[in-house]
């Protein structure tokens, strides 16, 4: 007779490992085994669920305090997370037109659990020199309007002539600032990428002048170029979203993975990152219909734990 195959429940029960309660100090200690990884991916089954957020915060705090993790990268828009990063690393405040994380869904990041973690990061960093402080970064591409404002503010301060040119180029997207998806419909109707060339030219101009700009402030240049990359990818994202979910989903995941790679390169060989994102982004998607994910697109999977 053929051997009896275990049920899904039996398989899960055999693999599952009991954990202490979230508030128990031993809960986070159970994850010390991952302290040697360079990237730890912490998922969630649903956005805004307190238990997931508290668990990730406890694990991340342990990895930062005991194992030297230097970055927290989350499924959030770059310019919004950058405002939090400046706060937790005690950097100069650069006001946004609107407060961070006010774009739907606000409850995803504007909640008590995230606030408590942000307060921990600020206290933790306040006791350390600038080079040893842990940063907070966004991997996602949705807040195109805030990224445009950030790029223009940066160029206004270092290269007013380039700022004027970029302002004209980004003006192509201005009619769609309140509803970016409308740009995709417009581009689809007209049959061409109306704003692709202007936004790519702005990014390329910044990269060509990298040596000049970095002399002013390397961190601010990195932030500005990340915003410029977000604008370029968001333009493409909203343009192709009407061609099918797979195309836009994979573009978004590729953007997040590329951002993660740039963060790690910018942070240096000793940088260690904790990633917070939905399971659909950081799980292994090889056997799903989505095709790519942060883990699957990596060519350095040995450094990843999720």
Which role fits each region the language model picked out?
Residues 2-40:
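N- or domain-start disorder-to-order transition segments that initiate the globular core
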Residues 24-71, 79-85:
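An N-terminal structural lobe/cap that precedes and organizes the functional/catalytic core
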Residues 37-43, 70-73, 121, 137, ...:
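Beta-strand elements within well-structured catalytic alpha/beta cores of enzymes
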Residues 47-50, 79-82, 143-146, 280-285, ...:
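Flexible loop/turn segments at secondary-structure boundaries
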Residues 75-76, 85, 93-142, 146-147:
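Long, well-ordered early-domain segments
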Residues 113-116, 127-137, 142-244:
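Long, well-ordered, tryptophan-enriched scaffold segments
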Residues 218-271, 280:
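Alpha/beta-hydrolase fold catalytic core
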Residues 296-303:
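Conserved small/polar residues in nucleotide/adenosyl-binding loops
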């Amino acid at each position: 007779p053929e051997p009896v195959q275990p049920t899904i429940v039996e398989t899960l029960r055999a693999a599952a490992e009991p954990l202490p309660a979230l508030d128990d100090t031993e809960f986070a200690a159970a994850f010390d085994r991952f302290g040697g990884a360079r990237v730890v991916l912490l998922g969630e089954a649903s956005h805004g669920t307190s238990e997931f957020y508290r668990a990730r915060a406890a694990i991340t705090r342990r990895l930062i305090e005991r194992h030297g993790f230097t970055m927290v990268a989350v499924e959030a828009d770059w310019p919004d997370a950058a405002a939090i990063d400046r706060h937790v690393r005690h950097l100069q405040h650069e006001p946004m037109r609107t407060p961070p994380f006010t774009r739907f869904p606000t409850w995803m990041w504007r909640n008590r659990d995230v606030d408590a973690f942000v307060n921990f990061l600020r206290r933790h960093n306040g006791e350390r020199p600038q080079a040893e402080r842990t940063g907070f970064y966004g991997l996602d591409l949705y807040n195109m309007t805030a990224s445009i404002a950030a790029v223009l503010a940066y160029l206004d301060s270092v290269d007013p002539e380039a700022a004027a040119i970029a302002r004209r180029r980004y003006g192509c997207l201005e009619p769609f600032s309140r509803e970016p998806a409308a740009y995709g419909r417009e581009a689809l109707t007209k049959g061409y990428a109306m704003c692709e060339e202007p936004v790519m030219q702005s990014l390329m101009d910044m990269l060509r002048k990298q040596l000049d700009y970095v002399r002013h402030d390397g961190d601010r240049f990195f932030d500005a170029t990340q915003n410029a990359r977000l604008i370029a990818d968001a333009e493409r994202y909203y343009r192709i979203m009407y061609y099918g979910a797979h195309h836009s989903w994979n573009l978004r995941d590729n953007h997040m993975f590329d951002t993660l790679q740039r963060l790690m390169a910018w942070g240096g060989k000793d940088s260690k990152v904790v990633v917070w994102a939905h399971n659909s982004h950081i799980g292994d998607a090889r056997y799903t219909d989505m095709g790519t994910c942060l883990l699957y697109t990596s060519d350095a999977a040995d450094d990843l734990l999720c």
